[in-house]
């Protein structure tokens, strides 16, 4: 099943340099907890190399470079939520078919792409269209699918639940734009894994500039922010938890690089 893809930001993220700098955290007690098990279906796209999963509608670019690897999924529109579902983590098991591996092993995947609807088909009438609203559906990378079921099945029923994302290190900000426009891709998000709001501040003084959601996991600010160290405030879409990452970049920051904070969600 085909999944949406994007070439925007791929080259920049491939060449990204991760720069770790000091940050300070301010949080509220809003830890994300695993949700209840729910029935759905899963398919896969691409081959064993997972090359077709690179890029994607979240804008993470090369998934090896951005830390997500091949344990990834393209979400149906219902779960993707116009990009606010990017970075969320799901645990699932194949159930109810001989194609499931013995013991029904659980896998955990990160949402990195959109599985678009196919209105010409209806799964209730024996066709495709498994990603059509209001269905919850997962179009997995083939390596992820193969860890829970025989790939020759093509599609299997699953039980899934959303779970906290375990990430090593702090939030990562891949920066693009021009002297008058900053576009930041937020990656390596722990906890709920998603981002619902974001602010940026340049230098030690001045106020916070609220960023608007662009697409996928990216946020933008129309402001001149060059030549000053950048700090970010990030709010989780699901929990409302906010963290402050101070001094994420040096004053000499550059477009095309990725900078890592020392804070992350709980």
From Swiss-Prot:
Keyword Cell wall biogenesis/degradation: yes
UniProt GO cellular component terms: extracellular region; membrane
UniProt domain Expansin-like EG45: residue ranges: 55-170
Positions of disulphide bridges: none
Domain Expansin-like CBD: 180-261
Main location class: secreted
Localization per Swiss-Prot or TrEMBL: Secreted, Cell wall; Membrane
InterPro entries: Expan_Lol_pI (IPR007118), Expansin (IPR002963), Expansin/allergen_DPBB_dom (IPR007112), Expansin_CBD (IPR007117), Expansin_CBD_sf (IPR036749), RlpA-like_DPBB (IPR009009), RlpA-like_sf (IPR036908)
Keywords: Cell wall, Cell wall biogenesis/degradation, Membrane, Secreted, Signal
Keyword Secreted: yes
Membrane topology: Peripheral membrane protein
Biological role: May cause loosening and extension of plant cell walls by disrupting non-covalent bonding between cellulose microfibrils and matrix glucans. No enzymatic activity has been found. May be required for rapid internodal elongation in deepwater rice during submergence.
Protein name stated in the entry: Putative expansin-A30
Organism of this sequence: Oryza sativa subsp. japonica (Rice)
Gene: EXPA30
């Amino acid at each position: 099943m085909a999944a949406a893809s994007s070439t925007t930001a791929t080259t920049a993220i491939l060449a990204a340099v991760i720069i770790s700098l000091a940050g300070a955290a301010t949080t509220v007690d809003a830890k994300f907890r695993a949700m209840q098990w729910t029935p759905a279906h899963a398919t896969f796209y691409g081959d064993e190399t997972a090359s077709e999963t690179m890029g994607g509608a979240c804008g993470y670019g090369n998934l090896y470079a951005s830390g997500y690897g091949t344990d990834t999924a393209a979400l149906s529109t219902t779960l993707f939520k116009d990009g606010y579902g990017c970075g969320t983590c799901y645990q699932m098991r194949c159930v109810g078919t001989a194609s499931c591996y013995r013991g029904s092993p659980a896998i955990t995947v990160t949402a990195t792409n959109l599985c678009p609807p196919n209105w010409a088909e209806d799964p209730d009438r024996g066709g495709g269209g498994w990603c059509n609203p209001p269905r919850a559906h997962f179009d997995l990378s083939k390596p992820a699918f193969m860890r829970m079921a025989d790939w020759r099945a093509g599609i299997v029923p699953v039980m899934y639940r959303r779970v906290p994302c375990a990430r090593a290190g702090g939030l990562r900000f891949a920066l693009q734009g021009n002297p008058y426009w900053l576009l930041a891709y937020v990656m390596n998000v722990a906890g709920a894994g998603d981002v619902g709001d974001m602010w940026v501040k340049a230098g030690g003084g001045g106020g916070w500039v609220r960023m608007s959601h662009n697409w996928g996991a990216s946020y933008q600010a129309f402001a001149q922010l060059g030549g000053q160290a950048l700090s970010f405030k990030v709010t989780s879409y699901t929990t409302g938890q906010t963290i402050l990452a101070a001094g994420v970049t040096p004053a000499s920051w550059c477009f095309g690089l990725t900078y890592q904070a020392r804070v992350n969600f709980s």
